[in-house]
Amino acid sequence: MMFRVTSVGCFLLVILSLNLVVLTNACLSEGSPCSMSGSCCHKSCCRSTCTFPCLIPGKRAKLREFFRQR
């Protein structure tokens, strides 16, 4: 009887430790706020949000945005 209680306890301990490993290795999905690229799933943190890929607008896009606001 004591052997069964010990083995069940060990089994539950292993399951608990595996759940903790999954939680600590979880990455942030696209659109989530981030502070560094390593925390995002696609390893791309742009302007404090996870995006894939990291697109930086060029002069043409900024000019279109300027005229759109007028």
From Swiss-Prot:
Record-linked PROSITE patterns: I_CONOTOXIN (PS60019)
Record propeptide residues: 61-70
Gene Ontology annotations for the cellular component aspect, listed alphabetically: extracellular region
This protein's name: Conotoxin Ep11.12
Signal peptide positions on this chain: 1-26
Source organism of this protein record: Conus episcopatus
Disulfide links within the chain: C27-C41, C34-C46, C40-C50, C45-C54
Compartment(s) where it occurs, according to its Swiss-Prot or TrEMBL record: Secreted
